[in-house]
């Protein structure tokens, strides 16, 4: 059979979760871009090679792509993934393939402790953390026939935090 949907959801950040221009290392740059950009790009290339006349490619980014201090490599890698989403969308549109990106805000997947939640929730206009099902429902929509004319878009699922 064939694969109709590719979901690129790999991500890594450096071991401390933050880097600055003064502290960044080549290893952190290489490792972050290898997973967050090169991995998705190579998976997409293989998907395109084996495509028919239909397909959905959905990338996962983050609101950190809007650039936050102390997240240089992570934010830049996800901003690059968003740019690739738009470029690839133009290239493969004639083949009936859509390419979109979902950009979540702070999502409660177990890594947000009570202390961090108290800091971040006030920054979200809708007043609560994003849940994994919020992301999943957006991805399912983009993979569906209802989204057949949506391509090259970055869909922000952030409760209004990233506009």
Where are these regions (language model features)?
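Catalytic Tyr-X3-Lys loop
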Residues: 4, 22-41, 58, 81
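A short, exposed helix-loop element centered on a Lys and neighboring polar residues
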Residues: 44-45, 86
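Alpha-helical segment proximal to the catalytic Tyr-Lys
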Residues: 49, 90-91, 148
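Short, small/polar-rich loop/turn modules that mediate ligand/substrate recognition or access, typified
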Residues: 93, 98, 150-152
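Conserved mid-core segment of classical short-chain dehydrogenase/reductases
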Residues: 12-30, 70-73, 111-114
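Catalytic loop of short-chain dehydrogenase/reductase
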Residues: 12-13, 58-80, 85-94, 106
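Short C-terminal tail/terminal secondary-structure segment
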Residues: 18, 139-140, 151-163
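A conserved structural motif in NAD(P)-dependent oxidoreductases
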Residues: 124-135, 146
């Amino acid at each position: 059979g064939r694969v109709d949907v590719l979901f690129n959801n790999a991500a890594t950040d450096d071991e401390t979760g933050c880097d600055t221009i003064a502290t960044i290392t080549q290893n952190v740059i290489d490792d972050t871009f290898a997973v967050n950009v090169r991995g998705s790009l190579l998976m997409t290339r293989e998907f395109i090679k084996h495509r028919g006349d239909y397909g959905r490619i959905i990338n996962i980014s983050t609101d950190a792509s809007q650039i936050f201090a102390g997240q240089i490599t992570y934010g830049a890698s996800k901003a690059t993934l968003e740019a690739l989403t738009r470029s690839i969308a133009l290239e493969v549109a004639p083949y009936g393939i859509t390419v979109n990106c979902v950009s979540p805000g702070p999502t409660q997947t177990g890594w947000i402790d009570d202390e961090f939640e108290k800091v971040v929730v006030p920054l979200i206009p809708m007043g609560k953390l994003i849940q994994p099902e919020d992301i999943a429902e957006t991805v399912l929509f983009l993979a569906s026939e209802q989204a057949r004319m949506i391509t090259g878009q970055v869909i922000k699922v952030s409760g209004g935090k990233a506009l």
